[in-house]
Amino acid sequence: MNRDLSKGSVVKSMLLFAIPMILGDLLQQCYNIADTLIVGQFLGEKALAAVGSSFTLMTFITSIILGLCIGSGVLFSIRFGQRDENGLKEDICASFFFITAVTILLNIIAYISLSGLRTFLRVPDEVWGDMKEYLFVIFMGIPAVFLYNYFASYLRAIGNSVIPLLFLAVSSILNIILDLWFVIGLKLGVAGAAKATVISQYLSGIGIMVYTLMRYKQVCAIWKIRYLKKERIREIISFSMLTCIQQSVMNLGILMVQGLVNSFGTVVMAAFAAAVKIDAFAYMPVQDFGNAFSTFIAQNYGAKEKKRIQQGLKAAVRISAIFCVVVSTFVYIFSKPLMMIFVDAKETAIIMEGVRYLRIEGAFYIGIGWLFLLYGLYRALGRPGMSVVLTVFSLGTRVALAYILSAIPAIGVVGIWWSVPIGWALADIVGLLYYKIKKQNLVEKEPEM
């Protein structure tokens, strides 16, 4: 199932590699969709607001792990393109030890800081009880998030995007079954929804680890100290930490916006919780396509296939644009029925606020589609620092505008919604201008690791 992306048709290579990744992440969204749908329909508005705020926080925490795994995956792709098997083993060993340590530390910090989150996120009293109960359980799944994303990153780096999809498919089905059983059958409340997600996460995490260790002997280097080199650890830290910073800054900005949203009350919180799930589901395919594109570029960068890099970029821009136009049209037209999937039809105030959010965000998905391509391009060319710059620029603009615009009485909460596409557009302009100016140097020079 391995795929050498430095050979064959450019468009076909990218699409065949990207499709399983897209399907896989759409299934992963089903983890969160199942929680939101069942909680919203059977546990009510306050529980939905609690799970929605928890989702934003967990996205921030797991983004740190995800960033480290994505960064390591890019290095794996470059080594694979270079046919450097020994270097690949050393990177595997160094990255596994480092990310394991970070995961353990992160899990400890999450539990220690649990009580302080109430003030930081401005969580209303009537929501905090459910939110705390949900988070206490969901934090147990952090190690599982690491296991799945680490081994999935390795498999994708060598061109295998099918196996991660299969493990996610099984765990997603299990998640939905357990959600229904725990919440509706056993009446376990929000804790039941969290338990369903955690059990499913461990199934996919442990399963993909066992498969990868049995199928690819070079991955057994994670246990072999002789492959643990100081220079590789420095390389992993310098490269992966920048990708980690990019992912965590991205979600820290969203977390700050969540705090602002919470200050507008339970109705806006619930609308945001449901709409964000739809939003993430809608643009998740272009995010995954951006990650697949990054692997394509990294393998070709390692193989020194400069012409294919240029061809791949042009093709990716067109593919992303076509997809975004289709999805934007769908979300804009069907925003109300989409909201009613998560919210009872009687909750008209929540539905209408969610519709307003979706029609503003949905009209500009092409902005985030191209931004994901730029993130992937700069990571793959060994310039993760530029991805961080674009993320800080986009999120900085978004957070600043959200606070400024929402403070104007005539604009209010809608200012938060408009800040998002504006941030996307400005970051796109900066990223494209930088590429246009530095194009030749980016492809010619060695990666900055």
Please identify what each model-predicted range represents.
Residues 1-18, 76-141, 185-241, 297-364, ...:
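Short alpha-helical transmembrane segments in multi-pass integral membrane proteins
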Residues 16-35, 137, 171, 200-204, ...:
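Transmembrane helical elements of multi-pass membrane transporters/channels
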Residues 60-63, 175-179, 205-209, 281-284, ...:
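Hydrophobic transmembrane alpha-helices of multi-pass small-molecule transporters
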Residues 69, 138-156, 164-172, 193-208, ...:
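Short runs within selected transmembrane alpha-helices of multi-pass transporters and secretion channels
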